[in-house]
């Protein structure tokens, strides 16, 4: 609902009362979800330009040069609230929406990533949400033929009642064939293509801009869209064929705020008149407000010259898609909606699209770190607890549901990053962040998320091209939450600037709180990162290899997996030095290592258990610190001979080989058999399969 202040501001600006269609348009387009009214000043601090950035923030997706003849379109979106109310359809339509964002740039979607965040799996409701979100993503992605090649899973009590479903899509397009979402000239027509419009998703943008109520599953169900991936597949091929004609002048996906959002934003540099009665409908008796604001899926809006309308219609019909010539671009900077000859909305377009007042929220720093308390449990018990935590455990139950090889470009998807072959180079992809660390130290945690994703790319020898983000936070009306948000954006921007990685697009999702579970999510500025390098697969260390750690280990247990399973507390990791990322990237590029992985969740123990489960380690100092600390900017590397690391600061920790994972330190040892490791790492799969 529009606030009383906003409604009064609009009455004064227009000099009259608003129609119901106008109120609905402003309610959605002035919502947090569409207008970024709480975050615009912060977002302007991010570095958005770079030598390969062809089109940065402001369109449906960003365009980044990959080679002289190939560019990537990349975007990232959230579908958080819908995925709680209806996890299957909420997640599925989240995939569909970001795919259409990339498609609207004239790009063929080639890959998806899905960083996901849930409450702990000891609660049946969270298991239900987890299962159906993954099913929704898998079914939609598989049906449209776009591989899900990378993801992230985080389980924390703060996400109970408000899971986060973030999706990254990447597409490819020739640099000279890029479409944009801004109309080109008055007199051109706006043609709606795709599914018929129904009442599903009504008010979705407004719904995404408030807390989840206790009865959200029932009361907010009409705000959740229902997807049809088979229509989406036809729409992909139809839009690409239309773009190939050179007659599509601009294009936009119908997402948040439906036709009202797409057409007003598209025509914001001129004006538009929309004939709502011409829209092809799925349900009888729909009124103009419903037609304009419904968020029915699988719909696109294209601008074409009047003489080319029939050409677009013929292509749509070839793919058995419905289409309607529903509007025109006008020179007058107004947004006009008619229905059966009656004007039902007539407002200044710049007021609707760019006139949202900026919110200025108070902020309050906080201190959340607690003193470290050493756990009483034996090291082996702690090791098995950490390995069985779902953040660390094997993710096979998830990725086995995804078709990762469709389109035949996927080279590798396991371990640190996904690799796709584009022409003769590799597109390397990573995603995610660590909400527990960011909660304790918002600035440092967000900055370290940049380093973590760049580290994943470095393990495959790739250099970052760009970042996209989803800024997921609780309600900014709480001063401590707005401080989290501010510090996270500043940390992200400063590290991206330092590493010269432009932030080219993204999404803001606020009000992630649950009345039902009485939770506020931990701050989650989830990232997607794309990089470029030589084509290579991740390789496991070989027997006899020397294992070494590059990068210094600190006493950083706060927000760690060890902290999650024991409540030990402690300090979160400090700001890491990004210089080590370049060192490791060069090592990989020069072929001096036989295997490499970065150290992140679960520390050295988790890394070694996954990449070299049969190894002999000798640790100096405190084994708790060596095994479980989660200091950023560290890598586990394998080399045939330590001489390969000459001139690089490192610490040898062991060798690959043997019958088990054996760890020795002064005064103690730990042996984990292959059976024990497999049982611990399979904990999530066992839970979800039986």
Where are these regions (language model features)?
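Glycine-rich phosphate/pyrophosphate-binding loop regions near the starts of catalytic domains
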Residues: 15, 24-234, 240-249, 264, ...
